[in-house]
Amino acid sequence: MAAFTCTSSPPISLRSEMMIASSKTVSLSTRQMFSVGGLRTRVSLSSVSKNSRASRLRRGGIICEAQDTATGIPMVNDSTWESLVLKADEPVVVDFWAPWCGPCKMIDPIVNELAQQYTGKIKFFKLNTDDSPATPGKYGVRSIPTIMIFVKGEKKDTIIGAVPKTTLATSIDKFLQ
């Protein structure tokens, strides 16, 4: 997994907010996003006393988060599961995820890379566990992200959590013919 560093000093546009005049409490709702090596950095200010906010900004109130999950990998749901996954001629990798899941967002770029790398050899699908809860329940998905590999309709392997690309690739390679 790629390492990244977030800068701890606030952007110039926010430094001026540290010098807010006179009032004890200031109500601001500011959110700015900055790109840091493929990740988004969020600076967020809310209703706090000016001393507290200035102190937080001096400490570097910057939070790093992974990008929203939006991919070219086709979606599968409870109603399309059988036709797309169980009846597929080639091996299938299914990424069980949810939009609110931080680790799912972290592993998303890795799954996308692997989908491109294995194009024509293996099919990749994503299943949103919030929108389609029956299928994850049937396969015992209790934690996300969970990645399952199916061969001829049979579950062959399960990988739980945000794991490195090499771990996923090794698991996938076992089922290629």
Swiss-Prot record:
Subcellular location: Plastid, Chloroplast
Domain Thioredoxin: 65-177
Keyword Nucleotide-binding: no
Keyword RNA-binding attached: no
Family indicated by similarity: Belongs to the thioredoxin family. Plant M-type subfamily.
Site (Contributes to redox potential value): 102-103
Gene Ontology molecular-function annotations: enzyme activator activity; protein-disulfide reductase activity
Record-annotated active site: 101 (nucleophile), 104 (nucleophile)
PROSITE patterns, per database record: THIOREDOXIN_1 (PS00194), THIOREDOXIN_2 (PS51352)
Its job: Participates in various redox reactions through the reversible oxidation of the active center dithiol to a disulfide. The M form is known to activate NADP-malate dehydrogenase.
The protein's name: Thioredoxin M-type, chloroplastic
